[in-house]
Amino acid sequence: GVVTLLTVLFNWHRETTFVPLGVLWLTALLGGADDLLNIFYGKERHPRTLGRIARLIRIHRDVKLRIWYLISFPWQAYKRLFYLLGSHPGRGVQAHEKIIIQLIIGGIIAWWLSFKLDWTELWVPWLGHVDLGVLMAPVIIFLVVFLANAVNITDGIDGLSAGTLIISYGAFFAIALKQQSSDISLLTATVIGALCGYILFNIKPAKYQMGDVASLGMGVLLTAIAFALDRPILLPIIGAVFIIEIMSVILQTTSKVFLGRRLLRMAPLHHHLEITGKGETSIVMYAWAFSAIFAIIGIWLSFQ
């Protein structure tokens, strides 16, 4: 709310700040809906198995329902894929539903960059700009979804995600200043200020939690800012902690499904470190230091 208010009052540039703020709010609404359903309104879901649905398609007396089950079978198979990968039916917005909404949000950013701003080139250090053509839109959508969930997964220990977000946004703030992009630098400075105020109440013992409302939105906005500065290739470096966290979950899930064993005692990585005896404060401090090192590397690479 603070970021939106200050940006609208003092940094409103329709071409560069309208869409980032819009997708921030869309993603925050998604996270808010999930949190509210989990706390107040949601009901536990008990989905039918695919075998049961296939049987109903063949034998149900109501022809209309048989047609409905047949039409909705691909959607049911899509849901079961997520359950197979470790998602569980709960009371809030389900993982498969979140992905669909995030893909739509990624599509909005892809439209903004590819068609509104006519960007089809990806900057690469030392190589300059590489024209991706029609592949630019899928790259944008993938990074939006990936980073949103990466930041969300990192939000598991007091101060962990907030501190690393401050460092990551700080790196892009430095890049924006160097590029003399006043609107993006003001937007990132506003986000940093809001996060600095928040982290005072989020370090251990936390009085407030970020939750899906902020973590998903912060990940999407970070990606949008990286694209606005023509530096999305640096996201895996500047956001190294987020990438490591989500990759630990992906590798853990892949190992469980295909090899039948765990790589970590618990995913994401910060929970594994907790279980092995590392204190919360130590984990957070090491993550901040690691993030700062890679942020500096990212800033250096941005000028190559």
What is the predicted role of each segment?
Residues E280-L301:
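Final/C-terminal transmembrane alpha-helix of multipass membrane proteins
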